[in-house]
């Protein structure tokens, strides 16, 4: 993993940054080895490599995330990596759930919203049009409810964590027009 990190330049994106799964050869390619952040990961972060969650159905491990965050390697962007195979994976039903996991890790509502909106837009050089509600922007909005109360989270390695709050999607607005129905189900805490 260190060899790969050393090749990344400022602005390059390392997604699945907190993965706990091995690669196709069976080697673990985590930025954390034996509880310690790889020096190459911190060096990449310091030179401007973007660290993206990319949760998906197999790429988020609490033990990797907690160690990396504690040792100074915070995520820049939150993405779900949702696709046909990951959408029904335990622990990863939708983007707001991934955002909620990071609130449970100590990030504020403002931080997780920025990591899922304005920061990704900046990474792909699409500000102020994307990730913004400025005049002239497309008017794409995800309306969420902050639900307080005990909630259980699980990662893709079946590590469990308890939280006190989660985000529930309520309505989507695309190009200024409400899209679909207001969400009631299946977005319920299980």
Positions of the model-derived regions?
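His/Asp/Glu-enriched, well-ordered alpha-helical/loop segment
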Residues: 61-146
């Amino acid at each position: 993993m260190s060899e790969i990190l050393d090749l990344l330049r400022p602005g390059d994106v390392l997604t699945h940054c907190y993965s706990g799964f091995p690669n196709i050869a069976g080697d673990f390619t985590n930025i954390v080895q034996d509880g310690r952040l790889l020096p190459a990961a911190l060096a990449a972060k310091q030179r401007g490599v973007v660290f993206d969650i990319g949760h998906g159905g197999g790429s988020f491990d609490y033990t990797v995330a907690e160690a990396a965050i504690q040792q100074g390697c915070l995520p820049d962007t939150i993405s779900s990596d949702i696709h046909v195979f990951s959408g029904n994976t335990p622990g990863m039903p939708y983007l707001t759930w991934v955002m909620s996991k990071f609130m449970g890790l100590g990030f504020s509502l403002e931080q997780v919203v920025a990591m899922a909106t304005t920061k990704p837009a900046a990474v792909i050089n699409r500000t102020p049009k994307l990730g913004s509600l400025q005049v002239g922007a497309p008017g794409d909005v995800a309306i969420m409810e902050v639900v307080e109360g005990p909630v259980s989270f699980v990662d893709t390695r079946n590590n469990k964590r308890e939280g006190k709050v989660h985000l529930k999607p309520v309505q989507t607005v695309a190009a200024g027009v409400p899209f679909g129905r207001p969400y009631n189900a299946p977005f319920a805490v299980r």
